[in-house]
């Protein structure tokens, strides 16, 4: 993991405006660097909070106690505020924009001090080349060196993505790996873990990761057992075959002997909302048998992915160019259309598909538009518009799909083995990190949990929520000395007003900070 700031105090939703002006004291008279006075300390353990002072020295929590006598060079009055560990985003795509804007404004402003990237089977290392300036690296050592030079505003941990590993060794073809390729991939995973990767991720709805059979996944996850690090998976299916996909993930982790983290757990499409009980039952059964199974989720009812993900996996064999070629073929094209329309119907139609980003300047007006209405305004069929968007952007088209249940979301967030994530990037309301029309989760997830699901709906307590945002994810990926407010731990600290904290980013206007 690369670290940037050992001490961050973030005021959320106006909390900074209520903080007293720091009183500066002479260094010779101060024992601590910073003392936060009189806040309500929720330490990340899940236990009830206490009113206390928090003293910080040399980048670490030095003391927590009521009315500490010794002073700090900087003293901050935080009475009426919650003082908590800096949040850990266990499923982040912040590695996509950090290189252009290392300030990570949308991350820091949510109180997130550590992001775990390399998700859904894609990581910045290992790669054979830095294609299209995407900042990919030959090894994890090279990645850490580059991040060290970049000095981003947040701590960064990364998993190694099995889709990236497969592309590195096998390419993008839909075929089994050879014995030699398996040896190479296993070595790559071993090397990544030895050089600081905090787990292994897969994206089994994306190519080339979707082409990996269970046996390949098991073999590549076995090195995790030695490190006691998790296999984090974007399941092979999150709708009609969700229960089977959960079963596959549990089986992979069982056979590999490693912990399992189910990424952004969801039941997609109204006809699948009733499957959550069976999913929870599968998780409970696995845990009773001795497996370590947990999951994460962001607090919204829509997901974000690539528009190509609406198209069947078999049609994406070989990449976007092959997909677009097959679309134009008589038999294959008709089958692709039929299966794509079935997928769209599952989530409620084209008006539940919003375009979140395109690379073609010609199609920028489509960003933020529902595809059904956008196509109607053009007098065209939505499927044909989708294909044209992909063609003109070389497949680089993002989408938001509206397909989830509020009740299920609350149950997932409140579940004892659930954690909070953004599944979003690092954005800014100005500069190079303002891109497209993204899902609001990248700017509002953690404040939204605290505002909507703790304060308003009371789906979980403040202490439970903070634990799911700090100590649980930190422990999950082996971050020692982070995720708790405790003596000797890194002074990653967030301060906020629990009565007023609020997310402001919306699907209509995502570029708004909390």
What kind of region is each of these model predictions?
Residues 1-14:
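N-terminal secretory signal peptides and thylakoid transit peptides that target proteins
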Residues 24, 28-34, 41-86, 503-506:
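Histidine-rich, glycine-flanked metal-binding segment
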Residues 96-124, 129-159, 177-195, 218-226:
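Alpha-helical scaffold segments that flank or form the walls of functional sites
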